Amino acid sequence: MLAVGMAGAALLSACSSSSSSSTTTTTTKPGGTLASNNAAFLAADLKAPGGSLNASGSTFVQPFFQSAFYTYSSKNQGLTINYQGVGSGAGITAFEAGTVAFAASDVPMAASDLAKVPASAGPVVQIPDILGGVAVAYNLPGVSARVKLDGPTLAGIFDGTITMWNAAQIAALNPGVTLPAHAITPEVRADSSGTTYIFTDYLKSANPTTWTLGTSKTIAWPATAVQTPKNSGVAASIKATPYSIGYVELSYAIQNKFAYAAIKNAAGTYVVPSLNTVAADADQKPNVSATDFSIVNQAGATSYPISGYSWAILLQKQTSDTTGAQVVKVLDWTTHTGGGQDLAAGLDYVALPPAVQNQVRTQLLTVTGTTGQTLLSK
């Protein structure tokens, strides 16, 4: 069985102006070879103990988790998985308080957060669970052409220094497009958000000296910005607000049929987010860790520059053998080909590269139970 908090997960089906379709060059995803014993682990994963498993956090990953956990529970009907999409920051807070068995965040826990976890719990294990893009979606009546934006212009829109759709900076990037003489309404997150972190990480990377609002899950946005919690909240606000522009995980943009911008990447190419372009960005940095996780603004002609991994966070030393076994088996199944990763493309996410999947399993094999026993097995 599955119980997923839908307040933060609803994928709205209404559409906005102009098409978001695009043709992109197929790009090889980051490589590596999946471990030969993968099938044996996946079979054992489906034998997790019954009961109830509680988790919370990222809304970036929630549409994927919703489908993956539903599929898992259809194969192991004794286990109910309760995932609440409350935002990365709130999920980490719940994890620190011990009210959830694992959390999800689009940015790994910082040192200040890790310090709040009891030392007796051992090192916190942080594993990638999916790969996705952050789309810059907009509601621009009367404009059918896809809008092009670069780093400086996007930063100006969100720091409040570019306020009109027909501003010279935007017009220069979109020759031949008649842009409305109308004020821009920036749509941003009000809560502590990993999606915000990825977005502002890109803005800082693309504008190292001029982006002054920082790289963080929470930002002191200008007064002109409309602040709404969760990806679903920002999507709903974009839908309801003509002349607005905001950032949402790609699956929310596609499900809402939003128009979204082509962003100028580090190679000088205008690229829209897609499975191929997000994979191309990740391909430029095949090795990621909880301390070296940013993949924004990578080189490569087809790289989409606002891309990132989402992360699952759990204790290395579990205080309950039952809950611990549930956590590692569900997460192992979810993060591997043959399990949850098979669902990624159909939900507009990019599956973890095989090398990253192998890294994830290696980390999950370090998670132990009350007597020090390894909880993940094949």
Residues covered by each model-derived region:
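Flexible loop/hinge segments at secondary-structure junctions
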Residues: 16-17, 25-378
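Terminal low-complexity, poorly structured segments
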Residues: 7-8, 30
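Sec-dependent N-terminal signal peptides
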Residues: 1-7
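C-terminal motif of bacterial Sec signal peptides marking the signal peptidase cleavage site
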Residues: 9-14
